[in-house]
């Protein structure tokens, strides 16, 4: 049976954070329950061909999935088991906001099968948390973290954000050091991105932030980036992707599957799917082997459309090749030349020989007989590197 991943989107949050451009917002208990019922219906509407696949990971993302009750998460997991073949050791992750954690929820999430938590901390500095619009303090995060440990969670990720307004190199180091002292199995460390439509974008891009804390300058941001890798490696966290670090054996399997282009089904509003033609019951065209579908981002449209989920758009071979490179090169071990040729029936050198030679001469890429990967310098300018792998249609 071929591997498959599931993503379940929970679009609810207590309030929108200043940097967040994800599909999320506040909702009442009645709305949450109605949404869970729609998710159950959508999962049950999957075609029989999903039985040809085994689910290796499930990710509850948001929003704030931990706003759902243990019973609601249990119902969703029961439905997944009813429709899909779930690996015994499947990785089942739930994103969690420290301000929404209770012991009862944690206990019931564990009973439902959740075996990995991703806790959104972002900073240990309460003033930085306030600026971000977070609903919790650092102490509340610590309480939630220890409560999760006490309830049997032995695989925990902590999300962090650098380059926050008013943040200094020293305060970022304190965040890293204090989080590593807690010894989570995994740490995701992202640099703040000002996304259009967010509170931060309006303040720092459109209004140019005439008052209040300023964004760190480029030198400070770069130092934070370098300090992250240095301190993580020193404390036993291996960098396996541009923004992700893990102790040995604790790399996020769901994320690795995404970067390695394992098929995935997304459930809920705005959720994306990437599926092979045989899963959706359609004959594959000559160009492209995978299809993409994104659910509507409006609840009213989603409620009436998910039954037609599998009317998907076939990716062209060009799009697939570009994704193969963009996603694979995010991993520290890069991409496999053999896997490229086996999947596309063409050698990597024939398609990308010129940009690879150019980037190698600039010391942005390295390669051996089978693999191509980013150098440390290439990681620093990864977006510029990825542009080189765009193909003309």
What is each residue range found by the language model?
Residues 371-375:
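Minor-groove-contacting beta-hairpin "wing" of winged helix-turn-helix DNA-binding domains
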Residues 360-370:
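A short, conserved structural fragment
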Residues 11-22:
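Local cysteine-cluster metal-coordination motifs and their immediate loop/turn environment
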Residues 377-393:
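Short, amphipathic alpha-helical interaction segments positioned at domain boundaries
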């Amino acid at each position: 049976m071929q591997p498959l991943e599931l993503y379940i989107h929970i679009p609810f949050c207590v309030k929108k954070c200043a940097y967040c451009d994800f599909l999320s917002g506040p909702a009442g208990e009645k709305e949450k329950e109605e949404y869970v019922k729609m998710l159950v219906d959508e999962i049950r509407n999957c075609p029989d061909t999903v039985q040809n696949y085994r689910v290796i990971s499930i990710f509850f993302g948001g929003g704030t999935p931990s706003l759902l009750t243990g019973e609601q998460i249990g119902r969703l997991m029961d439905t997944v088991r009813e429709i899909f073949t779930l690996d015994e050791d499947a990785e089942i992750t739930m994103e969690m906001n420290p301000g929404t954690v209770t012991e009862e929820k944690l206990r019931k999430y564990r009973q439902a099968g959740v075996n990995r938590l991703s806790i959104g901390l972002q900073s240990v500095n309460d003033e930085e948390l306030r600026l971000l619009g977070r609903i919790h303090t650092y102490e509340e995060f610590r309480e939630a973290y220890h409560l999760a440990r006490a309830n049997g969670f032995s695989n925990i990720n902590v999300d962090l954000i650098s380059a926050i307004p008013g943040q200094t190199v020293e305060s970022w180091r304190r965040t890293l050091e204090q989080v590593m002292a807690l010894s989570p199995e995994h740490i995701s460390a992202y640099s703040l991105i000002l996304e259009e439509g967010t509170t931060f974008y309006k303040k720092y891009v459109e209004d140019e932030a005439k008052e209040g804390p300023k964004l760190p300058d480029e030198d400070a941001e770069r130092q934070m980036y370098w300090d992250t890798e240095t301190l993580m490696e020193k404390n036993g966290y291996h960098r396996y992707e541009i923004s992700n670090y893990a102790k040995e054996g604790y790399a996020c399997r769901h994320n690795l599957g995404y970067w390695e282009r394992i098929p995935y089904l997304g459930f809920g509003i705005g959720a994306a799917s990437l599926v092979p033609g045989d899963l959706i019951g359609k004959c594959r065209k000559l160009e492209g082997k995978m299809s993409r579908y994104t659910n509507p981002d409006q609840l009213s449209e989603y409620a009436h459309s998910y039954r037609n989920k599998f009317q998907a758009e076939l990716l062209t071979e060009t799009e697939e090749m570009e994704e193969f490179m963009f996603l694979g090169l995010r991993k520290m071990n890069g991409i496999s030349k053999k896997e490229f040729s086996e999947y596309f029936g063409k050698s990597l050198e024939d398609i990308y020989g010129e940009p690879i030679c150019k980037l190698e001469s600039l010391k942005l890429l390295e390669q051996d007989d089978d693999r191509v990967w980013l150098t440390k310098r290439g990681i620093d300018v990864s977006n510029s590197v990825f542009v080189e792998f765009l193909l003309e249609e």
